[in-house]
């Protein structure tokens, strides 16, 4: 299935999300702070990131990690979670490129629905991007402009 990185400073939350996703057939990596999250992201390029906004004892908060992810891998969907949910946080996360926002405590069905939608949307975006690049390359090979 998919490689998903879960970033949360709370071990119980990381373990719960990991178990849910593992049971759905996903490969899951865990990070408890911004340093380990950025390290995983730079080494392995996850298919999706589940990211807590408030990371205690971290150099970066979730919004800063989100900005970094979107600069380096704009097609990677990020689902933001927070136990301190308010509309301002959700709006800020979506403005920075988050796919969706889930408030803790969440229910399993909600989490899986959002993750499945995010993965499918990402797959379709990558497919469109690939087809566009293929068309551009074919157009260059025949010396055309791609226009009819």
Question: How should each PLM-predicted stretch be described?
Answer:
Residues 39, 61-75, 92:
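Short amphipathic alpha-helix used as the core "switch/output" element in two-component signaling
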Residues 10-29, 43:
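Two-component/phosphorelay signaling modules centered on CheY-like receiver
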Residues 9, 104, 144:
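A Lys-centered signature of the CheY-like receiver
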Residues 8, 52-54:
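Active-site residues of response regulator receiver
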Residues 30-48:
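Acidic, metal-coordinating helix/loop segments flanking the phosphotransfer/catalytic sites
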Residues 132-148:
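AAA+ ATPase active-site-proximal loops
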